[in-house]
Amino acid sequence: MSPQTETKASVGFKAGVKDYKLTYYTPEYETKPTDILAAFRVTPQPGVPPEEAGAAVAAESSTGTWTTVWTDGLTSLDRYKGRCYHIEPVAGEESQFIAYVAYPLDLFEEGSVTNMFTSIVGNVFGFKALRALRLEDLRIPPAYSKTFQGPPHGIQVERDKLNKYGRPLLGCTIKPKLGLSAKNYGRAVYECLRGGLDFTKDDENVNSQPFMRWRDRFLFCAEAIFKSQAETGEIKGHYLNATAGTCEEMIKRAVFARELGVPIVMHDYLTGGFTANTSLAHYCRDNGLLLHIHRAMHAVIDRQKNHGMHFRVLAKALRLSGGDHIHAGTVVGKLEGEREITLGFVDLLRDDFVEKDRSRGIYFTQDWVSLPGVLPVASGGIHVWHMPALTEIFGDDSVLQFGGGTLGHPWGNAPGAVANRVALEACVQARNEGRDLAREGNEIIRAASKWSPELAAACEVWKEIKFEFPAMDTL
């Protein structure tokens, strides 16, 4: 390099390492309506001040790097940098605090959850100055959410397609999840749908294994759907899992489902990836297919209280990427605090506008403008005795999914489905009459079982079954 060139390059540039807080901690900053806002739970290494740790998160998830670079002078850092604009302590935790970070909208590609997460959480979680880091919540501004299609159809369109109103929808995951032949699998689907369920479901790891290839499963399940529809006069569906090893194979399976004339397909959105999920959601809207989403692998990301991402962030990301249903936990039998947190992200899935409410874990007011809503799915260890609580907690706009609670009935699959349908109809009728489901739930189920032998048998089998463990997800 010539002396003349060296002089020009060094004008206004001082090499070396400087504290992040000098550039990225800006408590005077007033957030803009177009900013993406993030709330991080930060656990810094001993000796690292909160302001420096919060600024480091803002820097490493936006424009910063470990040292000053001369190319900073070729752009406007003030326009593009993330800013840590507020820090608050976490009650009961001396070494943790919440850092609020604002990101300019120009940092993100339109309509790409993949790019949004690559920026915000892609690199910073391995930063040495932090012992742990958890993304608790995101505020998605309307200016960004309007660049997404979102759910293929949404709650109202799904109800119109199914012609089902005024109650939660009923589902069932076929068990055993692995090992059945396609024909026996289809038989179980038929029996459950004929008994009164609205949907049956592939489990998350049912793809295309040697014992049951996907095309055979799709054919036998379609036969079960159409036969049960003809017998009951109701529209039925089975969540055909289109998840595959490549996007091309996934779309091929969705195309085959459309050609069969079935109403709904399914995707494992975390293991499949957001790019694949968004592609499938676009295909589903264009071709009239509903899209059920399974959250397999979520606990790897959201289970730890001080590191990872809270599920409410994954739920918001799914609403952007696209899905008509998503699994959201059950609440039943857990602690009250977890109930409030779960209902917080259930509202974020369903409602158009959700106010900030820290008691439910909602850090920001979220306006979804015209983005369709997503039906939460309650699934996992539930049975007929849980029906009053589930109906009261989740309301009509939900899917209540009983796997073992249907297929475990002592008389078989169809009676198991009958028991669940009778229990649901009894709870909905009691609620509509003004009765208190939380207080009178057991009485309502017992009364209904007097005229339904299928329900009476189910009540006897599961009367002692409880899942009482402390909740991991607390405020």
From Swiss-Prot:
Its cofactor is Mg(2+). The active site is at K175, H294. One of its GO terms (molecular function) is monooxygenase activity. The record marks K334 as: Transition state stabilizer. The modification N6-carboxylysine is found at K201. Binds 1 Mg(2+) ion per subunit. The keyword Repressor does not apply. Belongs to the RuBisCO large chain family. Type I subfamily. This is Ribulose bisphosphate carboxylase large chain. It comes from Vitis vinifera (Grape). The lineage of its organism: Eukaryota, Viridiplantae, Streptophyta, Embryophyta, Tracheophyta.
